[in-house]
C-alpha cells in the first residue's frame, strides 16, 4: 500500500482528485467546516434522513455535483479521538473496497494528529488483508493501492510521522497474521525459522536458529520435553536488531511458538481444536514486531527469542506426573501436558539472561483463564515492575492495542507447590492465568520482566475467524518508547 500525505484544507476538499473521497465527520453536524459542495450534500443527506449522525453510520454518494472525486463517502465517528477515527475509516472502507477504487483520499472535519494518521494506516491494512495461501478460491485482492491523507499544512509533519509509523506497524501486523493463519501442516517450527531468516535480509537484523542438538547442549530440558512427542523437529529462533551501541542493554521479546497444540497426552476436546494452530501467536507477534522495527530503524537494541515445537501425543510424549529439568536447573512436575506453553517459555526466559537485558517481555497465547477474565478486547499484562507495566499499558493505548494489568501476589505461588519437584506446571482452575504467570516469574529473577497473555486477543473465532496480529502495535510502540 502506498500511503501519502497531502497538505490541503477542509475548505477545498471538493477539488481533490482521487477515485474516491472518504470524509470522517464528528461532533456538531452543522459545524463540519467543509466547502460548499460537500457541506451542501452532507446537510441535505442529514435533513433527508439518509445519514444519522451516529458512530458507525456511513453514506455513499456517486458523482455529487461540484465535487471532483467520482465517489464520496461520509463516515461518522463517535468522537474526535484516534480510536473512533479508525473505526470510521474502517466503516467507510467497507463501502469502498468492493468498488474497485485504486486511489482513496481520506479527510476529517476535525484535526488529524499523528495518532489519527497511524490509525488510518492500520484501518486500511486491516481492510485490505485477505488470507489466500491455501485458498485458491479466495476473492481477488482489493484494487486499493494508494491512500492519500488530507491534512492542514500545520498538521502535515506530525501526520507524516504517524502515517509512516502506522505503515510500518501494518507490515508487521500483516506478517503476524499471515504466519498465524497458516494451517499447522504448513506453519511448522521449520517454517517459522524460515520466516525469521527472511527478516535477516532487512537492515540491522541477524538471525540464528538452534536445532535440537544445540538445545540439548544448553540443557533446555523443559522445552525439549514438550517437543519430544512430535516428529517435527524443534527450533529455537534467535533474532537480533542492532539499532544502538553494543553497550546498550536490549529489549528482549520472547514469543511462544507452539505451531499446533493438541494438548499432548492431556488431549484437548475435538471441538475448535483447529484453532490451536494459533498457539504460535506469541511467536508471530515477535516476527511482526521485528518487521515493523526494521522499517522504522529506532536507536534501540532488540532481541527476539522463539522456542518453537508442536505439542503432540505419541509413545515418546511426556506424561502427567513426569518430572523435567529446566535450563535453570529447577525441576518441574508436569501435572498437565496441555500446560505446555510455560514449559517452553521457561527455558527461553533463562536463555534471555545471556543478553543482560534492560527488560524482557514474553508474549503467549497461554491460558483460557485469561479469556474468561478479560474476554477478547484486552490482553492480560502481568508484571511486578510498576514502571514497566505502566510503559506497556501506555504503549497499548498509543497503538490502540490495549492491555489490562492483572495481579501477581506472592500468595498465588502456593498453588504451584509439588511433592516431587521444585514446582508443578499447573495450579488448579482458580486464578489460572495468574498462576501461569507466577510459574514464569520463577525464571526471571535476574531482570525486569513482564508477561502478556494474548489468548483472548491473538485471533478471532466465528465468521470472522482469523489472526489479529496483536500485540504487534503494543510491542512496536513499547520498543519506540525505549529509543534514546
From Swiss-Prot:
Main location, first listed in the record: cytoplasm
Stored PROSITE patterns: CYTOSOL_AP (PS00631)
Co-factor binding details: Binds 2 manganese ions per subunit.
Keyword Hydrolase (UniProt): yes
CDD domains: Peptidase_M17
Class of this enzyme: hydrolase
Catalytic activity, EC: 3.4.11.1, 3.4.11.10
Gene Ontology CC terms, in alphabetical order: cytoplasm
Residues making up the signal peptide according to the UniProt record: none
Family label: Belongs to the peptidase M17 family.
The name this protein goes by in its record: Probable cytosol aminopeptidase
Taxonomic source organism: Methylibium petroleiphilum (strain ATCC BAA-1232 / LMG 22953 / PM1)
Source taxonomy: Bacteria, Pseudomonadati, Pseudomonadota, Betaproteobacteria, Burkholderiales
Name of encoding gene: pepA
Amino acid at each position: 500500500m502506498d500511503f501519502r500525505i497531502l497538505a490541503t484544507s477542509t475548505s477545498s476538499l471538493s477539488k481533490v482528485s482521487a477515485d474516491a473521497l472518504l470524509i470522517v465527520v464528528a461532533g456538531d453536524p452543522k459545524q463540519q467546516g467543509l466547502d460548499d459542495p460537500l457541506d451542501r450534500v452532507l446537510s441535505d443527506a442529514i435533513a433527508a434522513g439518509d445519514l444519522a449522525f451516529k458512530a458507525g453510520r456511513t453514506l455513499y454518494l456517486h458523482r455529487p455535483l461540484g465535487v471532483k472525486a467520482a465517489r464520496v463517502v461520509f463516515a461518522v465517528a463517535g468522537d474526535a479521538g484516534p480510536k473512533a477515527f479508525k473505526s470510521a475509516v474502517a466503516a467507510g472502507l467497507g463501502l469502498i473496497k468492493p468498488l474497485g477504487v485504486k486511489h482513496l483520499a481520506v479527510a476529517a472535519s476535525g484535526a488529524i494528529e499523528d495518532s489519527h494518521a497511524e490509525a488510518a494506516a492500520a484501518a486500511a491494512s486491516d481492510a485490505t488483508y485477505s488470507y489466500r495461501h491455501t485458498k485458491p478460491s479466495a476473492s481477488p485482492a482489493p484494487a486499493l493501492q494508494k491512500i492519500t491523507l488530507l491534512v492542514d499544512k500545520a498538521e502535515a509533519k506530525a501526520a507524516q510521522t504517524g502515517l509512516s509509523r502506522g505503515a510500518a506497524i501494518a507490515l508487521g501486523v500483516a506478517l503476524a497474521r499471515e504466519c498465524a493463519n497458516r494451517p499447522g501442516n504448513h506453519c511448522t517450527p521449520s517454517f517459522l525459522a524460515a520466516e525469521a531468516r527472511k527478516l535477516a535480509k532487512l537492515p540491522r537484523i541477524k538471525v540464528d536458529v538452534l536445532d535440537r542438538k544445540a538445545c540439548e547442549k544448553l540443557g533446555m530440558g523443559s522445552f525439549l520435553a514438550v517437543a519430544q512427542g512430535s516428529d517435527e523437529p524443534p527450533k529455537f529462533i534467535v533474532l537480533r536488531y542492532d539499532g544502538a551501541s553494543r553497550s546498550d542493554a536490549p529489549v528482549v521479546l520472547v514469543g511462544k511458538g507452539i505451531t499446533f497444540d493438541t494438548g499432548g497426552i492431556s488431549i484437548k476436546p475435538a471441538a475448535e481444536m483447529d484453532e490451536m494452530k494459533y498457539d504460535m501467536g506469541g511467536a508471530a507477534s515477535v516476527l511482526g514486531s521485528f518487521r515493523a522495527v526494521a522499517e522504522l530503524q529506532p536507536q534501540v537494541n532488540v532481541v527476539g527469542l522463539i522456542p518453537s515445537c508442536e505439542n503432540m501425543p505419541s509413545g515418546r510424549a511426556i506424561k502427567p506426573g513426569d518430572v523435567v529439568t529446566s535450563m535453570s536447573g529447577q525441576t518441574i512436575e508436569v501435572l498437565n501436558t496441555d500446560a505446555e506453553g510455560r514449559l517452553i517459555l521457561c527455558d527461553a526466559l533463562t536463555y534471555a539472561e545471556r543478553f543482560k537485558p534492560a527488560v524482557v517481555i514474553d508474549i503467549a497465547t497461554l491460558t483460557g483463564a485469561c479469556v474468561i477474565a478479560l474476554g477478547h478486547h484486552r490482553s492480560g499484562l502481568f508484571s511486578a515492575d510498576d514502571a514497566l507495566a505502566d510503559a506497556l499499558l501506555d504503549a497499548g493505548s498509543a497503538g490502540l492495542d490495549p492491555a489490562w494489568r492483572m495481579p501477581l501476589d506472592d500468595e498465588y505461588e502456593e498453588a504451584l507447590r509439588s511433592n516431587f519437584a521444585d514446582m508443578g506446571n499447573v495450579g488448579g482452575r482458580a486464578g489460572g492465568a495468574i498462576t501461569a504467570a507466577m510459574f514464569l516469574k520463577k525464571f526471571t529473577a535476574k531482570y525486569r520482566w513482564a508477561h502478556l497473555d494474548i489468548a483472548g486477543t491473538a485471533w478471532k473465532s466465528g465468521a470472522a475467524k482469523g489472526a489479529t496480529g496483536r500485540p504487534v502495535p503494543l510491542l512496536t510502540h513499547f520498543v519506540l518508547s525505549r529509543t534514546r
